[in-house]
Amino acid sequence: MRSRSAATLLLGAGLKNVYSMDGGIRAWQGMVAHGQPEAGMAYFTPAANFEEIVGLAWALEEGSKLFYQGVSENFSNDKEIHTMFGWLVSAEKNHEKHLLETYESLTGEKPDFTKLRSKFTSMDESVMEGGIPVKEALAWVKDKDVSESLELAIAMEVNALDLYIKMSRSIEDEKAQHIFKKLSEEEQTHLEKLAALLDKKL
């Protein structure tokens, strides 16, 4: 990872074989998520209630799904990478399904994502986990190799894991706590699989 704090986060979440890069973020030459460490939480700050929080989490999962789908297509000639990102697309779809069902059970209606996005000037386009616009991320990976694309995916998943852990601890609603705890556990699984594949490709 690019920093000791990120490495500490992953170790605290139960991941093994975590390393910190010499030089930290200043030595990193790849793409980075926008904003400060609390930036992910900021997406949810204007949300008036739990229903909006669930809807916004869905929007971030949708953005990640679109990104993984694009990367999978980019590496269609690499069976392992194509399969991995295809699996991540399915995983994000499952997250969306769970969040959508939760939203509908709470409100009795489908979420209006256009209305939700209008509350956030930074979400006037598809944004994925980590706060990165999907179009920007897909443009970045076009001329990158497998390892760089995997590293970006890992950075995204670290952001998502951090965000969902914070949400599960900061929300009082027990249903919300359960949802975000479950999501954080699944993001940890994503991280483990991506890290294992990156080790294999290096």
Language model feature labels by segment:
Residues 1-202:
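Non-heme di-metal
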